[in-house]
Structures are given as structure tokens and as C-alpha cells.
């Protein structure tokens, strides 16, 4: 029987955070962002193993951090996010037939969303979490508006993104061979003209990228009394 493995890309340097260490190792309420994320993934009973991609020079620190998560394997990441995910895909055991990819700096994902994306992918082969755009979206060029896009058709993409292994592996190998560049995993699947299902995401499933995001994360944890009471269900 095939199992589901998670790939957690967390090898970025976090330059937009303006700190002297990668953002995933910064703390929220005395615990690193990365550990909050791994705690959330650990609440998903269908995940057999997690592969954590970190900067090569932070592997020892990461192994120390995850000692309480025996199902987590630390792997050296690459220069870009897609390089890290590719390293993760190439590290998976043969029995892993499904792959869940989740950003290491999205610590507030609920187990309900993880399960919804996983169950949808089981039916369709590929599924992503996303939320509808609420702001007006315009396309610009050279500081001038070119057009206003139809907001009803715009989705703001998150992770988790879940795929049948052969689909996402083929998509990433095609990206290597053809020089494709993408900021999310589903974009490579789309370029193979394969369908990708959308699951309604969560507004609180924030990617902690900027100092303002970090402030919001601290506030959110304080307001919610920590993660333990909320990762089992959506808000």
C-alpha cells in the first residue's frame, strides 16, 4: 500500500525579514516557526514521513530542533525553492505514492485543510489550497496600469499542495529538462496540461515572510492561546 510523505521546503535565507538568520528559525512564542509548522503536520494521521529541506549550513541545527519529531528527515535544500523540492522528491522512499508539499513558514495550517487537500488529490491526482482574491487586482507595466483583472477568477495560492507522486515527479523532471521556473509546485503540473483541483484555503494560513507577518503571527498565537487548540479544525 502506498503512503503519503510530506516535503517541507525551508531552505530560504529570508532576506525580506531583515534578520541575521533564516526566518524559519526565528521564534514565535518561544518556539521556532519551523517547529510550529512541523507540529501542525504531525497532527495529520495520513502522513507517514516528512522530509525537511534546509540550508546546507543549517542541517545540524535543524536536526537538533526536530529531535522530538522522529518521522522527520533533514535534507540539504537547494539555491531556489524548486531546487529544494526536487531534492526532496529524489529523497523519497519507493513506498511513498503521494506527496504533500507545504511551506516551512506556514505554521498555522489546520489539520482540516491538510486532510481536505489530501482527500481531493486522492480523487483527482493533484490539489492545491487557495483563497479567493478580495482586493481588486490590476496588471501593470512600467508603473502604469495595463488592465484590471476579473477578481472572480483570481485565486491566491497557498500550500499544502498534494500530488500523486508520478505526476509531481514528472513535472519537476520536465522543469529541469526544459528550464522552467516557478514559485509553486502546481505550475509545473499545469505546464504538462494536467488538471489541478482547488481546495478552499484559510486566511490564517499565512506565509511568514516579512517583519509585519512575524508581528501578526505573535498576535495570532496570543489571541488563540497557542496552536494546540486550533490545528484540528478550521477557523
UniProtKB/Swiss-Prot annotation:
Keyword Transcription regulation included in the entry's annotation: no
Record keyword Cell cycle present: no
Keyword annotations of the record: Isoprene biosynthesis, Nucleotidyltransferase, Transferase
Covalent S-S links between cysteines: none
One Pfam entry name: IspD
GO molecular function: 2-C-methyl-D-erythritol 4-phosphate cytidylyltransferase activity
GO biological process terms, semicolon-separated: isopentenyl diphosphate biosynthetic process, methylerythritol 4-phosphate pathway
Annotated site residue numbers, Positions MEP for the nucleophilic attack: 151, 207
Top-level division of the source organism's lineage: Bacteria
Reactions performed catalytically: 2-C-methyl-D-erythritol 4-phosphate + CTP + H(+) = 4-CDP-2-C-methyl-D-erythritol + diphosphate
Record-marked site positions (Transition state stabilizer): 16, 23
Pathway: Isoprenoid biosynthesis; isopentenyl diphosphate biosynthesis via DXP pathway; isopentenyl diphosphate from 1-deoxy-D-xylulose 5-phosphate: step 2/6
Documented EC number(s): 2.7.7.60
Family: Belongs to the IspD/TarI cytidylyltransferase family. IspD subfamily.
PANTHER family, A to Z: 2-C-METHYL-D-ERYTHRITOL 4-PHOSPHATE CYTIDYLYLTRANSFERASE, CHLOROPLASTIC
NCBIfam families recorded: ispD
Protein role: Catalyzes the formation of 4-diphosphocytidyl-2-C-methyl-D-erythritol from CTP and 2-C-methyl-D-erythritol 4-phosphate (MEP).
Official protein name in the record: 2-C-methyl-D-erythritol 4-phosphate cytidylyltransferase
Species annotation: Syntrophobacter fumaroxidans (strain DSM 10017 / MPOB)
